[in-house]
Amino acid sequence: MNLHSKKDFQDCMLSILEPLKPYYSEEKARLTLGVTMAHYDIGATWMEAFSRPLWGLVPFWAGGGKAPEFEKIYRKGLTAGTDEKNPEYWGECTSFDQRFVEMAAISYGIMFAPEVVWDPLTEEQKENLCNYLNKINEHPLPVCNWILFAVLVNIAMKKVGRRYSPEMLEEYLNGLETFYLGEGWYQDGDSGQKDYYISFAIHFYSLIYAVIMEKDDPERAKKYKARAMEFAKQFIYWFDEEGEAIPFGRSLTYRFSQVSFFSVCLLAGLEPFPVPVMKGLIARHLRTWLKRPIFDRDHVLTIGYGYPNLTMAERYNAPGSPYWGMKVFAFLSLPDDHPFWSVEEAPLPKLAPACPQKYADLFVYHYGNHTTAFAPGVYSPNGHGQIVAKYGKFAYDTRFSISVAKSCYELHENAPDNMLAFWIDGYVYVRRICEESKITENGVWSKWSPYPGITVETTITPDAGGHTRVHKITSEIDCVAYDCGFAVSRGDFEEVGFAEKVDGMSAQASNEFCSCTVSAVLDENTQVNEVADKPPVGYMITVDPNTNLLYTKTKIPAVKYHIRKGSQEIVTRVDAEVI
């Protein structure tokens, strides 16, 4: 895909949204893209699908792009959706309402493309829209990135001279300060989580604030920009040389929003890296996504990651949710003479292999042509779906990706890649959340319990070939545990040259583009009679299809250990290679 000129990127954005046109309702306030449901009501579902394309259209319009049909759709839809007398009215708001999330994109439009979404409206239509958006000030919000939706609404209303709440604006901006940790990192409110919501939500919205409020609130604007510059130094480690991103945390179905932090940096006039580097990263990232089967037959984005997949979804994923990814196009607002449109793509800057990220609770290692994040399992227990798989694994890799569980009854259904999986009484138990953890200069340490009466202390030490795991286990029962490596594709519609080998205390899975070998390590102090009766053995798990986020059919190499009642230490070596 040619992504060089402004027109190239504009055409790319429009190619994603053009297929939606047949699915807008008569009054244009509803966009019906599928039949699956999220936990919120149908009115919010329609509003979400309607609003999220604005994350791409608004900067397109702000940068001079013309799309007359979409302009008419969105003016008519905004008018209908906020008119209580219209049959397509989006409905009343309640506490913690999904509608508040979708108000952010509409506010984005009012601020950056008023000539399309605001100026043409009649006075009555403007009043209806403002009254609807102001409902966000009348209800409580979750203490997380959601508070910034209210910030965007209030500064949008302020910009166009309409009613807003200075008190709520100040309260939420002060609340944002309580999220800040250091080195550019925030946590996502009281959840304590650090994931893509820090990049595509908190930094994204705070930089919009910095642009809009630079004259009214120069101190905060300067602070938010400085934090973004610092954050970029570590966040760039989440990508490999081909633009692939680490599949870590929730909302992975938002796909190419993973790189949108760098897009909004450009919008805000920030260059944490040279423009050619940022252009190269954004363009490569887009290409990796757009070559995958992420669209349905009508070219509508699907819920999933590398392919349609409801198993990995959160309870808040509705058919329109994936269009959050349109945030990647924030740079379309750049003027025609900006260097971004003429420079050639550059590769990533030279990065040190290891990057301990203490505020992110991650240790990231660049292996040349793939990148792995090693995690201690720190996250909120209030999950939205597959939370253990998205935060609790030992490793998250740009090329191997991760797998999600279908059940805890069988290993092949649990798909426990990069987990120490205990098999007890017919169930699979893995690390759900850690009790203690730390990120060191050499790796990751965590203390956790998969099952009552079993405690594990895991130390992970990455190096140039892979990583070594040391598990100190104290158990009140005898059981079996499988130390699992990365899932390796065994082919789907195309042959990938898959091969497997189980030999003694190791197992290897490989194909034409990658391999993973998992081996038990017995040090010189281990006595033969300690393991002779039940030594570790290599093991290959043929997992259920559609469990890995990138590859539809995989196998996971592992080592099977017999865990004795008492205390013991097991050491496993995982070598991973991308060819």
Predicted region positions:
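Solvent-exposed loop and beta-edge segments used for protein-protein assembly and interaction
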Residues: 47, 100, 319, 357, ...
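Aromatic-lined, polymer-binding surfaces characteristic
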Residues: 43-49, 55-60, 67, 71-263
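Glycine-centered tight beta-turn/hairpin loop motif at sheet-sheet or coil-to-beta transitions
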Residues: 205, 369-370, 450-454
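Low-complexity, Ser/Thr/Pro/Gly-enriched N-terminal "stalk/linker" regions
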Residues: 1-48, 72-77
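Low-complexity, glycine/alanine/valine/leucine- and proline-rich hydrophobic stretches
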Residues: 349-428
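Carbohydrate-active enzyme catalytic cores, enriched for enzymes
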Residues: 85-90, 129, 241-247, 252-383
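Short, conserved charged micro-motifs
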Residues: 67, 275, 479-481
